[in-house]
Amino acid sequence: MGTDIGDLLQKRKIELSDLSNRVVAVDAFNTLHQFLSIIRQRDGSPLVNSQGKVTSHLSGLLYRTASLVEAGIKPVFVFDGKPPEMKTGTLNRRKEIRESSKEKWENAKAEGNLEAAYKYAQASSKVDQDIIEDSKYLLDIMGIPWIQAPCEGEAQAAHMVLKKDADCVASQDYDSFLFGAPTVVRNLAATGKRKLPGKNVYVDVELEMIELEETLDSLGINRDQLIDIAICVGTDYNKGLEKVGPKTALKLIKKHGNIHAVIREKGMEIEALDSIKELFTHPDVTDDYEIKWGKPDSEKLINFLCDENDFSEDRVVKAADRLKAASGARQQTLDQWF
């Protein structure tokens, strides 16, 4: 999922309150994938309704978004469009991993190994078209705006921040920086304790903010060189150079200046290198969008979540009330400007 340059970035711990009154462009695909991975039963089974349809994403989207807007955050979800042709290899590899993980999950369940079952179940998660359409509808009736990107959601989210239509991008991946996002927030969808795979150890998952300029200054490079580092390590569009991690890539780029000089020096080749860079420097994005928050529709929320998907009516009503209260507070803040 994206490029592995996290060790090079300057991360700062923040609180939800630090994002109050800020517009956050949320990488929808990334966030839904998190919900599908995390919101599971002990044996790894996702939440489902009486028809066997997965509802983990709906649960995460409703309750976490309610918490965000309650904290004064203004989320706008950005959905992926058609992936670039150069991403086909990565998508095929992800499909193979999901299928293999699903088989291992079933075997672990049959053996009664719940820890292994949960681990493999998480890796088998898939955001399909039904999940996307249900998520968009839920956001609509929650009064939360969403935008359809023509291509990569992270590129569109970065574009919105650069246009000052949003204050930061929310994503677990680091690709947003390659697309030019000035500020990225991580762990917005889930904070708290997380168990390390295969170990009886729990770590704190805290909200992080990363500033692109701060990172570039600390590393002594520019954004173009950061893109070169990512390509050396590997991106969704290329495999990267053999035995080159982020720290080695940084040294190589600082020594030689750019990736063309690096591959010349090493006698290597990266297929379609200039086309890969072009995907980051000139991504396919749109200005045809509107960001507008509305009021939640309690009746439609109850019908969709409770009647159709077997959610607890009491919990849905409480979440709707939280969304309404936040919507009222948002309107009151707007009124103060006039």
From Swiss-Prot:
It comes from the Archaea. CDD domains: H3TH_FEN1-Arc (cd09903), PIN_FEN1 (cd09867). It is an enzyme of class 3 (hydrolase). Its cofactor is Mg(2+). Keywords: DNA damage, DNA repair, DNA replication, Endonuclease, Exonuclease, Hydrolase, Magnesium, Metal-binding, Nuclease. GO terms for molecular function: 5'-3' exonuclease activity; 5'-flap endonuclease activity; DNA binding; magnesium ion binding. Its EC number is 3.1.-.-. The keyword Hydrolase applies. Signal peptide: none annotated. Structure-specific nuclease with 5'-flap endonuclease and 5'-3' exonuclease activities involved in DNA replication and repair. During DNA replication, cleaves the 5'-overhanging flap structure that is generated by displacement synthesis when DNA polymerase encounters the 5'-end of a downstream Okazaki fragment. Binds the unpaired 3'-DNA end and kinks the DNA to facilitate 5' cleavage specificity. Cleaves one nucleotide into the double-stranded DNA from the junction in flap DNA, leaving a nick for ligation. Also involved in the base excision repair (BER) pathway. Interacts with PCNA. PCNA stimulates the nuclease activity without altering cleavage specificity. This is Flap endonuclease 1. It comes from Methanosarcina mazei (strain ATCC BAA-159 / DSM 3647 / Goe1 / Go1 / JCM 11833 / OCM 88). The gene is fen.
